[in-house]
């Protein structure tokens, strides 16, 4: 039964992912087939590396292997940090507002003059608290949050650490799941060549700072499925729930991993143990979420103007229900035309219902496909928006600024690399239909599927998928290697 369920999942994933890949190629605003051809060449090169070059690393002793890997990672980290400093940008949009609000938090231990913003954009509160704690430490060295180069330097450092931690966790997962030195090396190379990691290195925002938490949840699950002792299994399930909560507090979409974990618990063990693990996960998540909400209500924010300012979550679903699914000033003004939160919910629910009722089945399919392509088919993940406001002039402007000589080659490289990853993920899923795999690989696949479904309804932006790119890179690496027998 479990084997059949795995086959059905991977078959469904193939259909959905294949449709996204196909439409990403033919709807790309430039030459999609050319980028696909380059992506196929890159995939062939990665396959050749995984077959004939990297397996030689499996013969190294653990001491020599660690020396090689740690040296390579240290060089990568140094280059990554240097690039982040060169790419330093003037914060824009909500990132700028969050940074501007931090002195209020640091001065009072809560938000006073900025309470109104966090009533409206409560989703950014977790980001503000994370940055606030980090800038408190930076303040010990005389650094304060502002839009200057020295003011953003601590944020850039935190972001670099988060991205490097994500790469390290991904390599650790490759070791745990795929077992070999070659698998770790392949995963590391896929990450090192993934340009959006470099491009987002100076942008300390929720898309990057939430990334390690999803991987920690995946790592906890990988350890959970191997643990025989009941108490430790429950502790690991609770740890996974805690990791999901902290990721969710920074970026709400991370919560889909909790649903994927619940599904995997029941696929991995008997119902009694699965229920116990699910209870531990929900208890950890629920206690943390409840405490977080209570802290907001009791201390962090002045909620006096809640009825006048608060925006219900339905607004973002309303944005995602028409046109290209992006921000709509008309929706926002309609929501603010009524006086209470309850009235806004009712009004927005009516607008959402009316928007979807206006589509024929074919129109709805076209609309959802268009949203999926915007979200999953952009090789830059909207990085160009943040890089368009550099702090100072340097040689990187030759490729990060639109209209410069290196900009279009960068765009084509990023798109070709995305197509390579998409093709490898599709190939791995197709192989999993014939030889079903579960465990962390299936958890990654179910999590990506959950995000696809969620973002088909939510406001549409390519960067909203960015914090799940490590899951795609893990699936791509696994597609190039034979899965261990125990994972099947």
Annotate each predicted stretch with a short phrase:
Residues 1-82, 277-282, 483:
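Start-transfer (signal-anchor) and selected internal transmembrane alpha helices
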Residues 17-20, 24-25, 29-39, 150, ...:
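Membrane-interface anchor segments at the N-terminal boundary of transmembrane helices
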Residues 96-120, 126, 325-330:
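Extracytosolic helix-loop segments that constitute the early lumenal/periplasmic catalytic or substrate-binding loops
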Residues 100-103, 117-150:
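Short hydrophobic/aromatic helix or loop-helix immediately within or flanking a transmembrane segment
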Residues 108-112, 297-393:
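Membrane-proximal stem/loop segments at transmembrane-domain junctions that anchor or position
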Residues 154-178, 216, 424-430:
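Transmembrane-helix motifs of polytopic, lipid-linked glycan transferases
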Residues 167-193, 439-442:
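Transmembrane-helix signature of polytopic, membrane-embedded enzymes
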Residues 196-210:
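Short acidic/glycine- and proline-prone juxtamembrane loop motifs at membrane-interface regions
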């Amino acid at each position: 039964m479990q084997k059949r369920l795995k086959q059905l999942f991977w078959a469904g994933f193939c259909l959905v992912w294949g449709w996204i890949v196909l439409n990403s190629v033919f709807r790309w605003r430039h030459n999609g087939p050319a980028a696909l051809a380059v992506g196929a060449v890159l995939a062939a090169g990665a396959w050749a590396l995984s077959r004939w070059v990297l397996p030689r690393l499996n013969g190294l002793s653990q001491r020599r292997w660690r020396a090689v890997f740690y040296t390579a990672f240290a060089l990568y980290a140094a280059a990554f940090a240097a690039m982040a400093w060169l790419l330093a940008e003037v914060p824009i949009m909500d990132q700028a507002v969050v940074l501007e609000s931090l002195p209020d938090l640091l001065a009072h231990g809560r938000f006073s003059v900025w309470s109104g913003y966090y009533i409206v954009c409560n989703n950014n509160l977790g980001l503000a608290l994370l940055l606030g704690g980090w800038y408190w430490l930076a303040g010990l060295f005389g650094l304060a949050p502002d839009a200057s180069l020295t003011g953003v330097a601590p944020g850039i450092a935190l972001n670099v650490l988060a991205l490097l931690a994500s790469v390290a966790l991904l390599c650790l997962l490759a070791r745990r799941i795929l077992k070999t030195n070659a698998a770790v090396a392949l995963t590391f190379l896929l990450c090192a060549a993934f340009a959006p990691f470099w491009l987002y290195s100076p942008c300390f925002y929720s898309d990057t700072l939430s990334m390690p938490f999803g991987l920690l949840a995946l790592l906890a699950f990988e350890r959970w499925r191997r643990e025989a002792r009941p108490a430790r299994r429950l502790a690991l399930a609770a740890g996974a729930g805690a990791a999901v909560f902290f990721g969710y507090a920074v970026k709400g979409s991370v919560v889909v991993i909790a649903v994927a974990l619940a599904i995997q618990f029941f696929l991995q063990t008997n119902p009694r143990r699965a229920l116990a693990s699910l209870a531990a996960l929900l208890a950890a998540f629920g206690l943390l979420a409840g405490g977080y909400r209570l802290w907001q209500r009791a201390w962090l924010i002045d909620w006096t103007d809640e009825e006048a300012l608060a925006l219900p979550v339905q607004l973002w679903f309303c944005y995602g229900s028409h046109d290209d699914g992006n921000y709509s000033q008309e929706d926002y003004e309609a929501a603010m035309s009524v006086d209470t939160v309850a009235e806004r919910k009712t009004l927005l629910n009516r607008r959402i219902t009316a928007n979807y009722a206006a589509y024929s089945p074919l129109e709805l399919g076209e609309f959802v496909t268009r949203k999926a392509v915007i979200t999953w088919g952009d090789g830059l993940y909207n990085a160009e928006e943040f890089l368009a406001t550099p702090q100072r002039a340097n040689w990187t402007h030759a490729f990060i600024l639109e209209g410069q000589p290196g900009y279009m080659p960068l765009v084509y490289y990023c798109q070709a690399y995305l197509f390579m990853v998409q093709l490898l993920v599709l190939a791995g899923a197709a192989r999993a239909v014939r030889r079903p795999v579960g465990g962390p690989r299936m958890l990654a696949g179910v999590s990506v599927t959950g995000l696809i479904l969620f973002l088909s309804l939510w406001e549409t932006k390519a960067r909203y998928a960015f914090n799940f790119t490590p899951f795609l890179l893990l699936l791509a690496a696994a597609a190039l290697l034979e899965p261990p027998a125990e994972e099947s």
